[in-house]
Amino acid sequence: MSYMELSRTRPVAAAWENLTDAQNEKQTTAIYEIIGNHGGDVKAVTFSPSHNALTSVIEYPDQLSAMTTVAEILALGTLEYVEIEQLWDVVEFTGLVRSAAAKK
């Protein structure tokens, strides 16, 4: 079973100010490389105006992979995490609910 995570992040302003396009691309690539190095598969990256943050949905092989990714991205000093939430597969969860109800 994989581990699906929703995260909201904000750029650390000082890390992104006055960058050339090449420097910006290098920092962005570093983030995606960390995700990939831990088996992460980016499903979506959007901007959430109501949270004033980037919202990402990433699938990982397990929770440890997700946690290690967050730690390494924080170490870059380019993003801060506002919120991290585990997402449950609705079909899988519904099956668990039905199974629990059948045991009654």
Where do the language-model regions lie?
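An amphipathic, aromatic/His-enriched active-site/gating alpha helix that lines ligand/cofactor pockets
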Residues: 59-91
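A structural signal for short, well-ordered beta-strand segments
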Residues: 5-7, 56, 84
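Short cationic amphipathic helices and targeting signals
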Residues: 53-59
